Curated annotation (Swiss-Prot):
It comes from Sulfolobus islandicus filamentous virus (isolate Iceland/Hveragerdi). It comes from the Viruses. The lineage of its organism: Viruses, Adnaviria, Zilligvirae, Taleaviricota, Tokiviricetes. This is Uncharacterized protein 64.
Length: 108
């Protein structure tokens, strides 16, 4: 068992779904994108995420947040194109330690 239980669970979710997610799960992942950008997210969606992953998303370390970013990118490989201001998303990504390594891992 890793020191990062959320990361472990996310890896299992990605493996189990083989990069295919239900509409409900994508809805939760979309809420996480908003949450990681610092936007207010409906408490119901945070609760649903807590049920899916098993942890409160407000109390997780950076290493687990990196795993969440991987989950988002797995569900939405094109999601940078979904926003009018990609520079805002890029700023969020650049602030996450190790993000470039995560991208290399996913896309190579």
């Amino acid at each position: 068992m890793s020191y990062y239980p959320v990361k472990d669970r996310i890896e299992k979710i990605i493996d189990r779904h083989n990069s295919k997610f239900s509409e409900a799960e994508i809805h939760i992942i979309d809420a996480l994108i908003k949450w990681l950008r610092g936007n207010h997210v409906d408490i119901t969606l945070l609760y649903m995420f807590e049920q899916l992953i098993g942890f409160d998303p407000n109390r997780i370390p950076d290493e687990d947040k990196l795993a969440i970013m991987k989950l988002i990118l797995t569900a939405h490989p094109d999601y940078l194109l979904k926003y009018d201001k990609p520079e805002d998303i890029a700023r969020v990504f650049k602030s996450i330690p190790g993000f470039e390594d995560i991208l290399k891992t996913i896309f190579t």
